[in-house]
Every structure is written in structure tokens, then in C-alpha cells.
């Protein structure tokens, strides 16, 4: 088997940051935004979606697109169902926060549920309040009813759930089982008793700010704060030991109920290390489920995560619409998480300038879909296209960008003055940043022989500050200067700057090395999820499907991709010889 290529000269040009229904509201609209104009913009965006046969694809749902000659389907994972348990001071709260942020699960805590029901004055809340006022424990039947009600809500069904510290007894576990509430995994955070006691006894409360400190692990910032710290009543050694004893009795009782899905994690480590193990476990569950679904489902025209027939040019509206929406949702999620320097790398044939089927209109359609979506949310979006570059005989516009500004100007943005109000066109540079701009979409910024776009790009991001800047298919590798030699001065700094943009979306087709046909597979990443490696498999009657081979927390190297396709382990790959070993070394 020949080695595989990513059909791109800059496979390693960027790294991605560590990675749920998301709104673009995390972008702060400028004070001069005109909300009254959102209605016509919304109509225009919906019109574009209808024209492209857009279908919003929520996470973990199924949606079908129909074309005249085929049916394309996308099947996404079922949501995760997670239970987590841990003794007081085991770090359970921190891990819950990290899990929710990473996987978008609905966090369910019985304490929060009780307070919410009581505060809302519901029938269950009133019954619970009677027991709480009398100093009695709330009966299991009331707590179970609250938990079951919360799990039945649409957000928990769609996004999955994380049940925090519940059930606490075997009887509660049995009650949940009767209601068919079963977790995919039961995580037990394990910390030695002496460490737990030290964590609790060493805690101190600042009565002024309510902030919690630890005399050894997290000391106060000043002597003034230190002087006013107090020990919480429950953090005495005697009470901590009593709480631990109760926890042990309860946990031992429920371990048998979830022994088949229980995983014990050493939580006496830094929170980042603990979460890395937790994240791996949850990702493995997702991967196994995806593979199981692939095997159990009829293949026919089905695809998972990526469409088939990508060698058919021009791409159908359904295929284009899928990728536009896939890119959009990943970008929205990344911006919501506070990322401001983003890049999208997508090289389907119509968006790959190295192929003779490259279509500038498809790139412009993608940019328009992104711009209208954010404008629909009331944001002022500036779409930027670099101008003519180079010197003397080398002056001109990169082929990939030829005519893009005019195309954008002549595109149908609607009759509501969207273009010029919520969406404006500009060039790349610090002077192009206006105070009213909320975000910037840069169309394929790239270096040219004799000139480097990175200086202008850096000036623009500096002027933009914390406002999001999204690069669509950038090509930032160094090229020769007008004299024909590489621009060595400042090259290291330019490359470092290029790496400050994190991928929010990656889609790259895989070919045999040195070819662009046939497609052997694909690499996909949609923020904040893992990189997914697919292999294209031919089927009867000229059909095809994509089989998920592996997932990666970070962007896989060409060697890792070769190994996955050949079925080699890393130890075996080190012994590779012949043509395979030679091509692997070429990638190094």
C-alpha cells in the first residue's frame, strides 16, 4: 500500500487548541448595532439557507438531505449519559465543570434541583420544603421524581446529562433502574482519606468575599485577607471523618449496582491530569458507539460525518450546504468558548486551489453563509479580501483570490441593505479595522512571491483586539522574495505568529502520495471535538461509505495516518522498511 498524502503543502502549519447548542451571543455587538434591521437580515439568511437546501444539523440528531440521484444521510452519536461520584474534597465539582465545558452535557445536581423546586413553589418543591424545614431528609420518592423530571427535559435528551453525586444509595439506584435511567459510565473519583482530610481541614473561608482558600495549597493573597479567614463549621477534622464514613457506606452500596460501567479514577493528581483520563474515557465511549452504529446500520448511501461522492464535480447543493453548516457550527462553538484567533481549513475539491475543479464561487458562498449567520445575530461583520501584492513583474493577485472582491459585491445579499450595514467589505490591514466592527472574516489570506501578507494580518489582529478574526483557507507558508530568495528576516517570528490561529474546523481529503485521485479517506475536526480519521470503502453498485478508523486529541501526523490505514502499531511503524518506510520518512 502506498503512503497517503493530505494534498496540502501546509499540513503542519498550525496546531489546534484543546477542545454545546450554541448561540453567537457571546460576541458583543457594538453599541451602534441596529436591532430593528435584524428582521430583514433574518429573512435574507433564511432565503440563502432555502436556496442551498440548508438543514441545521443539531448535535446527536439525524437529518436527511435528498437529491435527484441519491439520498445522503448523516447519523450522529447518541448523547452521553454520565454519573460521577466522589468524596467531599475529591475534586468532583471541578471535574463536573470541565466535563460540561468539553462535552456540552447537562449538569444535574440534586441539591440544585431541590433549591430550584422550592424556589419555584412547585408541588414537589412544597413537599420537599416541609421535610427540610423540619430538619428531616427529603424522601427518596421526591428526589427521584425531581431527577426523573429533569432527565426527561429536551435539553438533557438532546445533549446528554451528567448526574452529579446521585444516586447515593442502592435503593436510589434501583429506583432509577426501574425508570430505565442507566449511565454509559459511572465515574468514581478515588482519593486517599488522609489527603481528603487535609484538603477539608485546611480550607478557610473569607467571610467578606465568600472565597475559599487553603492554607497550604491555595493561600490568601495578602496578610489582611489571611487575618480574617475562618474555618467553616463542617471542615473540622471530626466532622470531615464522619462525612467520609457516611460516604463510604453509601458508595459501597451502589458500586454493585453499576459495577459493569464503573471506572475508578485516581483523583490524587492535578485536575488537568485527572480530566485528561476522564476525557479519554468519554471519547472512547463515543467512538465505540459510532463504530457499533456503523456496523449495525444498513450501508447503502449512508455516510457518517462526511458526504460521499466528493469526486463528483460540481458538488451538489446538499453537499455544499452540509459543509457550510458544519463550518458555521464549529466556528460558533469556538467563539462562544472565548477563542478569537480562528482558522478554517477545508479542501473539498471545489475549495482546493491546487485542483483544476477549484470554484471561487463555492468559496464565496461559504463566506457569505458565515457572514449572514453572524449578521443575523446582530453582529457587524467585516469580510476582508487582500489586495494586489508583489513588486514589479511579480505584482498581482493570487490566482485563488482573482475577482473575489467583485464577486462579493455582485452577490445577492438581499434588498435590505445588509451589505454595507451589517456586512461590510474591506481589505487586510490595521487601517481596515473600524470601531463598529464586531468580527472579521478573512478570505483565503496568503503570501505571494515578492510579498508577505503576515505583516498586514498581524497589524489587523492587533487593531481588532479581542474581537474574533476568522481565516478561511489561509496559506501562510513563506515564499521567495522578489529577488528570488526566501524572506529570511523575521521568518521565525512570522511562522510563530501564524501558529497563534487555532483550527476551529478541519476537513482534508486523503490521497495516495503525489496524486489527487482516488480519494482514500478524510480527516475531519469540528471544534471542540476530536480529530476523526475516515477510510473510504468502495461497495457494490458503485456506492461508497466512510468508515471511522480512529480519533485523536491533537492533529495526527502523516505517520499516524499511515499507521491507521495500514493497521500498524507505533512500535511496528518504527520498523517499517521498503517503499512504506521510505515514504514515511519523507513525511517526517
Curated annotation (Swiss-Prot):
Summary of the knockout phenotype: No visible phenotype under normal growth conditions.
Presence of keyword S-adenosyl-L-methionine: no
Subcellular locations according to the entry: Plastid, Chloroplast
Main location class: plastid
Region (Disordered): 1-34
Keywords: ATP-binding, Chloroplast, Kinase, Nucleotide-binding, Plastid, Transferase, Transit peptide
Enzyme class label: transferase
Reactions accelerated catalytically: AMP + ATP = 2 ADP
CDD domains: ADK
InterPro entries, A to Z: Adenyl_kin_sub (IPR006259), Adenylat/UMP-CMP_kin (IPR000850), Adenylat_kinase_CS (IPR033690), ADK_active_lid_dom_sf (IPR036193), Chloroplast_ADK (IPR053021), DUF1995 (IPR018962), P-loop_NTPase (IPR027417)
GO cellular component, one term: chloroplast envelope
Cystine pairings recorded for this chain: none
Enzyme Commission number(s) of this protein: 2.7.4.3
Assigned protein family: Belongs to the adenylate kinase family.
PANTHER family: ADENYLATE KINASE, DOMAIN PROTEIN, PUTATIVE (DUF1995)-RELATED
Role this protein plays: Catalyzes the reversible transfer of the terminal phosphate group between ATP and AMP.
Protein's name according to its UniProt entry: Adenylate kinase 5, chloroplastic
Taxonomic source organism: Arabidopsis thaliana (Mouse-ear cress)
